[in-house]
C-alpha cells in the first residue's frame, strides 16, 4: 500500500472534464431555468409593487378629490343655511312690517270712527239742545212762532256761542 491517495494525472484530467461537463449540464438544464424563473419572479414582484404603488397613488388622488368635494359641499351647505337664515329673517321683518302697517291702519280707522261718532254725538246734542231751547223759548214767550223761525234762531245762537264749547 503505497499511499492511500495517489496523484494520477489522467484521473485528474478526467475529473476536470467530468466537472466541466457536469457544470455545463447543470448550467444548461438547472441554473439557466432557475435563473430565468428567479428573474421572472423578480420582475413579477417588481411589477406587483409598481402596480400597488400606482393604486396607492390613485387612491391618494381620489381621497384628495373626495376631500375637496367634501369641503365644497360643506361650504355650499353653509351658504344654503346662511341664505335660508337671511330669507327667514327678511320674511320675519316683512311680516312684522306688514303687522305694524295693519296696526296703523286699524288705529287710523278707529280714530276716524271715533271722530265720526264724536261728530254724530255733537250733532245729536245740538239737535236736542235746539229742541229744548225751542221748548223753553215757547214757554217763555208763550207765543208759538213757526218752527222754521225757531230753528233758525237756535241754530244762529248755537253757531255763535256754542261752537267753541263743542270743540273742546
From Swiss-Prot:
Keyword Isomerase: no
Membrane topology listed for this record: Single-pass membrane protein
TM helices/strands, residue ranges: 7-26
GO cellular component, one term: plasma membrane
Family affiliation: Belongs to the ATPase B chain family.
Protein's job: F(1)F(0) ATP synthase produces ATP from ADP in the presence of a proton or sodium gradient. F-type ATPases consist of two structural domains, F(1) containing the extramembraneous catalytic core and F(0) containing the membrane proton channel, linked together by a central stalk and a peripheral stalk. During catalysis, ATP synthesis in the catalytic domain of F(1) is coupled via a rotary mechanism of the central stalk subunits to proton translocation.
Name the UniProt record assigns to this protein: ATP synthase subunit b
Gene name of this polypeptide: atpF
